[in-house]
Swiss-Prot record:
Belongs to the tetrahydrofolate dehydrogenase/cyclohydrolase family. It catalyses: (6R)-5,10-methylene-5,6,7,8-tetrahydrofolate + NADP(+) = (6R)-5,10-methenyltetrahydrofolate + NADPH; (6R)-5,10-methenyltetrahydrofolate + H2O = (6R)-10-formyltetrahydrofolate + H(+). NADP(+) binds at residues 166-168. GO terms for molecular function: methenyltetrahydrofolate cyclohydrolase activity; methylenetetrahydrofolate dehydrogenase (NADP+) activity. It comes from the Bacteria. The keyword 4Fe-4S does not apply. Gene3D superfamilies: Leucine Dehydrogenase, chain A, domain 1, NAD(P)-binding Rossmann-like Domain. Pathway: One-carbon metabolism; tetrahydrofolate interconversion. Catalyzes the oxidation of 5,10-methylenetetrahydrofolate to 5,10-methenyltetrahydrofolate and then the hydrolysis of 5,10-methenyltetrahydrofolate to 10-formyltetrahydrofolate. Coiled coil: none annotated. The keyword Amino-acid biosynthesis applies. GO terms for biological process: L-histidine biosynthetic process; methionine biosynthetic process; purine nucleotide biosynthetic process; tetrahydrofolate interconversion. This is Bifunctional protein FolD.
């Protein structure tokens, strides 16, 4: 029987753990702080930021949302990031993407203190992940959330085959690194991959993050596989759906994430978890 991986419940459990950690910090007069910088008025960004802000406050995390006009210059945005870098009440800094045209997003991310890089996108932290270095450092939230989900399954990853469809810096590439670090044999597919189905059918764990509605059909998966759908798409009727044809794929596999209610809740829960991580690590360094 197929296991439907309940991202909402796993996120709820993770949030409860995070709230407990926040309460313990507050007993020592330490409050984790998250700063989210939004430039322009992208409607989707506004929804994401509002959800992050509400969740942070609910868990007891200090949440600062800095809204800036689309006319903000590179220098002005960099200056604001640098101010949060030295603010002892802020432990995590997030610059909401996409940024308006004319702003260099990579340069802005690189300006964030790597020890406050709550999204795990700073080149130093990306390099640490890909080098599988020991130590405490933030990583990309969605892939980390997926690893948390996989840990709830009665499956050993070591030695198994994983295929990641998508090579973005936000999901695909860090996801492949985390699975490789878990001793899986990993392949990464993308828009130029030939004979995609031949590759995806080899996967014991298939992670799909393309933004292409129902790209993966029942014939594209290995029977008994675990399928993680990162897609958040709209079908022709406006219904929220994913990159995987859930109704037809689910009966063939051992476990699958639904859309909605799968990966989505885990991303914000992991962001909150990582904000508290950064606060605790800062305390251990004697910065609080």
């Amino acid at each position: 029987m197929t296991t439907i991986i309940d991202g909402k419940q796993i996120a709820k459990d993770l949030n409860a753990q995070t709230a407990t950690r926040v309460a313990a910090l507050k007993k020592r007069d330490i409050v984790p702080g998250l700063a989210v910088i939004v430039v322009g008025d992208d409607p989707a960004s506004a929804i994401y930021v509002r959800n992050k802000h509400k969740k942070a406050l609910k868990l007891g995390i200090k949440s600062v949302v800095r809204e800036l006009p689309a006319t903000t210059t590179q220098a002005e945005l960099t200056q604001i990031v640098m101010a949060y870098n030295v603010d002892p009440t802020i432990h995590g800094i997030l610059v909401q993407s996409p940024l308006p045209a004319g702003l260099d997003e990579q340069a802005i991310v690189a300006a964030i203190d790597p020890q406050k890089d709550v999204d795990g996108f700073h080149p130093l932290n990306v390099g640490r992940l890909f080098a599988n270095l020991p130590g405490k450092y933030p990583v990309s939230c969605t892939p980390r959330g997926i690893m948390t989900m996989l840990a709830t399954l009665p499956m050993h990853l070591r030695g198994k085959r994983a295929v990641v469809v998508g090579r973005s810096l936000i999901v695909g590439r860090p996801m492949a690194a985390m699975l490789l670090n878990a001793d899986m044999t990993v392949s990464v597919a993308h828009v130029h991959t030939q004979h995609l189905s031949d590759l995806t059918r080899t996967a014991d764990v298939l992670v799909v993050a393309t933004g292409v509605t129902h790209l993966i059909k029942a014939t594209d998966v290995k029977p008994g596989a675990v399928v993680i759908d990162v897609g958040m798409d709209r079908d022709e009727n406006g219904k929220l759906t994913g990159d995987v044809d859930f109704d037809n794929v689910a009966p063939r596999v051992a476990a699958i994430t639904p859309v909605p209610g799968g990966v989505g809740p885990m991303t914000i829960a992991t962001l909150m978890q990582q904000t508290v991580d950064l606060c605790e690590w800062s305390e251990q360094r004697g910065n609080n």
